[in-house]
Amino acid sequence: MKTPKLETSRLYLQPLQAEDALQIQQVFPQWEIVRYLAAGFPWPFPQDGASRYVNQIALPASEKGTAWYWTIRRKEEPAVIIGHICLSDEQDNNRGFWLVPEWQRRGYMTEACRIVTDFWFNSLNREVLRAPKASGNDASKKISLHAGMRLIQTGKKQYIEGELDSELWEITREEWNRQSRG
């Protein structure tokens, strides 16, 4: 299934496009955004990092139908990218996101996660959503808790910041739909 446009009360989630790379390159390479990303992301972020990510990783995965990528934009400024969220068929890593620091702690990512999680379960018909995170990433944990996810595994993992305690969070379609209706 192609990545659809999604909308919440305050946000537009637009399917990622090649032309988004320029804006992403300008806002993404900030320590507060990258520190808890998996160690595979290049850091320091190269000048063509966003272009390579969008054109060599994200868009090909979207074309294959194994991942879905959106830019996050406020309705008040729909031309400005404030974050990114993706879903993937990758084992134990189904959802990832980042938000520009100045827009954090306003509920935007909770809102974006809610609509893409519903898409995962009720449009893509997946049975379970799993999201890994660094144990110290309290904001991400709060989003998972708010969504009704539960911690299912702990361990160590390499992040850009280094080797950190890591957690794997999960929610099933049945759990999601039960709480979403309730």
Regions of interest found by a model, annotated:
Residues M1-R35, Y69-G182:
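Acyl-donor (CoA/ACP) binding surface of acyl/acetyltransferases
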Residues A18, F45-Q47, E63, Q104:
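A generic alpha-helix propensity feature with a strong bias for hydrophobic helices
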Residues F28, L37, A61-E63:
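Hydrophobic residues in alpha-helical segments
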Residues V34-Q56:
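Conserved GNAT-fold acetyl-CoA-binding loop/helix
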Residues P42, E63-G65, G162-L164:
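Short coil/turn motifs at beta-sheet boundaries
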Residues P42-P46, W68, G136:
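Short, conserved alpha-helical segments within structured domains
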Residues N55-T71:
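A short helix-loop-beta-strand connector motif used in the catalytic cores of GNAT acetyltransferases and
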